[in-house]
Design a protein with these regions (language model features):
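A glycine-centered beta->alpha junction motif in the catalytic cores
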Residues: 52-53, 57, 62-72, 117-139, ...
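Catalytic activation segment of kinase domains across protein kinase-like and atypical kinase folds
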Residues: 241-273
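Helical subdomain adjoining the active site within ATP-dependent kinase catalytic cores
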Residues: 187, 305-393
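Conserved kinase catalytic-core helix
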Residues: 94-102, 129-175, 216-227
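Catalytic-loop of the protein kinase fold
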Residues: 230-236, 240
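Conserved NTP-binding catalytic cores of kinases and kinase-like/nucleotidyltransferase enzymes
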Residues: 1-117, 227-228, 246-248, 374-393
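Active-site catalytic-loop/activation-segment of kinase and kinase-like phosphoryl-transfer enzymes
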Residues: 166-223
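Active-site activation/catalytic loop segments of kinase-like enzymes and analogous catalytic loops
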Residues: 264-307, 322-342
């Protein structure tokens, strides 16, 4: 699989820059797509290749069949306008138009080419929001306020939906928090999937405990997820590592996943990944407290933006999506084969190592979700800080 992806990327890069001396770097960490850096003259680019729109981990597990069948299907897949990276190309162009229209501080990578399933875009510079939250000097509240302001402007852009509906760019419902949770934890194959999590990493009793925790989350979260309205277009993959900050104050957002969704999903994924970042990176106590306070301020502002009693409903929706994203992320890590050949994100590996504690915290928060969502958020925030400092929950 990886040899096929590498050969395809090299072929497309050479066709895009014939006669140029091109340097192609090693594979970059990702469980979703084949990623690599490309240098041409003095410029840097990123090449991305998707196999059947399915995560590389799923392909390696045989979820789409043996490799010869996958390779044959891939030849047809890359010609489809609904292919994942064909949609991403359209999304990047629509986001660039949004940035020009709003004259805000958002930038996105420039599309250079899309050929044979390979998307080439400009490489982006700047420090990541993840790094700034953990090690930076800027107040976390300011950082997160700036990010959410850009997201809000995106949600309110009534022209964006029209631009995207003219193509297949919004046809990405399978990447949403709700769709991912439904695919992983419900349906005919869910039981086998849950039973397989942790294979090669954990003993039988620990795996049974994990499956029980995931099942408990499914029973609470799935009925609530099914009732969520999806009235706006959201960025869809707003993670701390996908936001790059420039000294001038502008931000570059990479790896979009534009989709119709509840606006709470945007903040839910951002907060979910920040909590995992704190737990796995363990910044200084002062910085950790500042980030925790900034997250709490965001949630308070989010609730205050809804009239009573709608604020309680909005908070419940936010936390349902938050906990579902936690479950999705941990399940991905626990599904990694022990002999996997992929370079994996360090945070995924670190979070997987603490999966039992994280799932225990998620189940505790979920238990009070229906009755008292404010208490559930307090449980999440306090538990995050406890795990990040190595204290028992």
């Amino acid at each position: 699989m990886l040899d096929h992806a590498a050969r395809t990327v090299i072929m497309v890069v050479q066709q895009e820059w014939p006669g140029e001396v091109v340097s192609i770097g090693p594979q970059l960490p990702s469980v979703t797509n084949y990623l690599t850096a490309v240098k041409v003259r003095e410029g840097w680019f990123v090449a991305k290749y998707s196999i059947l729109g399915t995560s590389l981990l799923s392909i390696l597990r045989g979820a789409r069949g043996p490799w010869d069948r996958v390779e044959a299907a891939q030849r047809d897949y890359i010609q489809q306008p609904t292919a994942q990276l064909a949609r991403e190309r359209s999304q990047l162009r629509a986001l660039a138009a949004h940035a020009r229209r709003t004259e805000g501080s958002l930038r996105v990578p420039t599309v250079i080419a899309y050929q044979d399933g390979v998307l080439i875009s400009t490489a982006s510079s700047g420090s990541s929001l993840a790094g700034e939250l953990v090690r930076g000097r800027t107040a976390p509240a300011r950082l997160l306020t700036d990010v959410t302001a850009i997201a809000t402007a995106l949600h309110r852009d009534r022209f964006l939906t029209g631009e995207l509906s003219d193509s297949y760019a919004l046809a990405m419902p399978h990447t949403s928090i709700v769709a991912t949770f439904t695919r992983k934890f419900t349906g005919a194959e869910a039981s086998c999937y849950l039973d397989s999590l942790g294979t090669g990493w954990l003993g039988g009793s620990a795996r049974t405990q994990l499956a029980t925790s995931f099942q408990a989350l499914r029973e609470i979260l799935h009925p609530l997820l099914r009732r969520l309205p999806a009235p706006v277009v959201i960025y869809g993959d707003l993670k701390p590592e996908h936001v790059l900050l420039e000294a001038c104050g502008r931000q570059t957002w990479i790896d979009p996943g534009l989709q119709p969704a509840n606006p709470a999903a945007e903040l839910a994924k951002l907060l979910s990944r920040i909590t995992l970042l704190l737990i796995t990176s363990r910044p200084s106590l002062v910085r950790m407290d500042a980030v925790g306070a900034a997250m709490d301020l965001l949630v308070t502002s989010f609730v205050a933006g809804h009239p009573r009693p709608d604020g309680i409903t909005a908070l419940r929706r936010l936390l349902v999506l938050f906990l579902a994203d936690w479950a999705n992320y941990l399940a991905s890590g626990l599904s990694v084969p022990p002999d996997v050949v992929l370079p994996l994100p360090p945070m995924l590996l670190a979070a997987t190592g603490q999966a039992q504690s994280l799932l225990g915290l998620a189940c505790e928060a979920a238990a009070s979700l229906t009755i008292d969502p404010a208490r559930a958020w307090g449980t999440v925030l306090a538990g995050t800080l406890d795990l990040a400092t190595g204290q028992p929950g």
